[in-house]
Amino acid sequence: MSALDDSIRVEVKTEYIEQQSSPEDQKYLFSYTITIVNLGEQAAKLETRHWIITDANGKISEVQGAGVVGETPTIPPNTAYQYTSGTVLDTPLGIMYGTYGMVSESGERFKATIKPFRLALPGLLH
């Protein structure tokens, strides 16, 4: 664990995309908007992502790759980077979590944690 691990805060907002979903075919599309806030004193570049996505049946999908939405943004201190992406689940409920592989401007590699967040149809849970 790096001292820089806590220098990045990840905020998430999710939305069910009804018009592009097909419940009769067990296809539920969710978008998620991620805001990555650099609370540190150095710029930090997002190099990789690692997601673990679990649906209500316990089916686990893992997604790893370079950057996010085709970008590897450098986030200056006290600023934020935001993007929107999506995922399709076989069930109306699931969770996602993971990490971003980051590198500071001084070259130190560290992980930014993406805490678990829920993907759910509106009104499904109270």
Swiss-Prot record:
Alphabetical list of Gene3D superfamilies matching this protein: ApaG domain (2.60.40.1470)
Domain of life: Bacteria
Gene Ontology biological-process entries: error-free translesion synthesis
Domain ApaG: from-to ranges: 2-126
HAMAP family assigned: ApaG
Protein name (record): Protein ApaG
Organism: Shewanella sp. (strain MR-4)
